[in-house]
A protein has these predicted regions:
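Double-stranded beta-helix
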Residues: 225-245
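Short beta-strand micro-motifs in enzyme catalytic cores
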Residues: 17, 218-222
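Short, solvent-exposed secondary-structure capping/transition elements
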Residues: 92, 157-161, 235
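Catalytic core of non-heme Fe(II) oxygenases with the double-stranded beta-helix
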Residues: 117-200, 210, 217-218, 228
Length: 245
């Protein structure tokens, strides 16, 4: 039997999904302009400071204003589309039920949530991470159902730093980690940031951002948390009918 006669199908059904897309440059420019404005204003930095709520060893982390996000509907629409995609059949499989461990805001009295009960999603918080040489984000998770990161600026020196790394290069990378190492299975993936790249992943997925050494250059990103909206009344009524039966 020849190699051509042997048809092999690869199945990789396990593990969390990570969605990736590229954001239009004009959206990146709008977000950068807003971040530049905040970074240049000490009072705004103080008013919108978010570092106390985050795990990062980063000097400047601040929330984006609600007023700006209401105007920047293109970014919000992209996030909503990605949230819809995350629970699509071709990503989550054909099962009708989504586990409560995935939808953290689901009622505690239920064990599973069907897609029909999900009515949309809500972006909870959006913040900017202005990272400089030596700054890093230790291994952590987020709150909500989904989280994500969008890269707005990447130091030009990262590529050269990568070339100089002779052992497991990771400068400036983000790494996603789940489970434990096993034969024939990977439990982590590293991604090098590129301007305009946006990643969305389950909020429970551990991840870390590595430091870099390049001086006087910024690695700027936007992070966010999303929850799914659930029709609690419909779920409650239908559960009561099931219980009575």
């Amino acid at each position: 039997m020849t190699d051509k006669q042997i048809k092999i199908e690869t199945l990789l059904p396990f593990g969390p999904a990570i969605l990736k897309t590229s954001i239009p440059s004009y959206v990146v420019d709008n977000l950068n302009a807003h971040c530049d404005e905040t970074l240049a204003d000490e009072q705004k930095l103080k008013d919108y400071d978010y570092s106390g709520q985050l795990a990062g060893n980063v000097k400047k982390e601040f929330k984006l204003s609600g007023e700006f996000l209401n105007k920047e509907q293109n970014f919000s629409n992209i996030l909503r589309k990605l949230a819809e995609r995350m629970i699509a059949v071709d990503v989550r499989g054909t099962e009708e039920q989504l586990g409560v461990s995935y939808l953290r805001n689901a009622p505690p009295s239920t064990t599973n949530i069907a897609r029909e009960y999900i009515t949309g999603c809500q972006v909870l918080t959006v913040w900017c991470v202005s990272q400089w040489g030596g700054d890093f984000n230790p291994l952590h998770i987020h709150s909500g159902d989904l989280s994500g990161v969008l890269y707005l600026k990447v130091p030009e020196g990262l590529e050269e730093e990568y070339k100089n790394e002779d052992h497991h290069p990771a400068v400036g990378d983000i790494e996603f980690i789940t489970g434990v190492p096993q034969a024939f299975s990977r439990n982590s993936i590293k991604v090098s940031p590129k301007v305009g790249d946006l990643y969305v992943f389950p909020a429970w997925l551990h991840h870390t951002a590595y430091p870099f050494r390049t001086k006087d250059q910024e690695r700027r990103s936007i992070s966010f948390n999303i929850i799914y909206n659930i029709d609690q009344e419909k779920l409650k009524n239908e559960k009561m009918l099931v219980d009575k039966e």
